[in-house]
C-alpha cells in the first residue's frame, strides 16, 4: 500500500516537518479523510502498525490519526478499539502513546484496553 509505505517513510526519515518531503502527502491524506472516511484511516493505521514498530512512526500515529479518530469518532470506534487491543499487542502499544483528549467514559475504556491486565 503506497499510503502506508509513504507514511512510514516520511516519519522514519524525519520528513514529517518538511512539507516538501516526497512522502508528506501521506500525512495530509490522514487529515483529509479523518472526518468523512474514518474506516479507511482505521484500516491504514492497522496496516502501519503491522508493518513497523518504529518509535517515531508509532508516536506520530498516536498523536495524529489515532487521536483524531478517537476525538471525532470515539463513540463509534470504542468497541473496535477494545476488540483490537485484546488481540493485538502492537495496537495496545499504540494506545499507550495516546494522550487523554476525549470524553471521560471513552477515555476510561481506552485506559482499560491499553493495559496488559
Which residues does each PLM region occupy?
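Alpha-helical solenoid scaffolds in large eukaryotic transport, assembly, and signaling factors
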Residues: 1-111
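C-terminal partner/receptor-binding element of secreted or periplasmic proteins
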Residues: 114-117
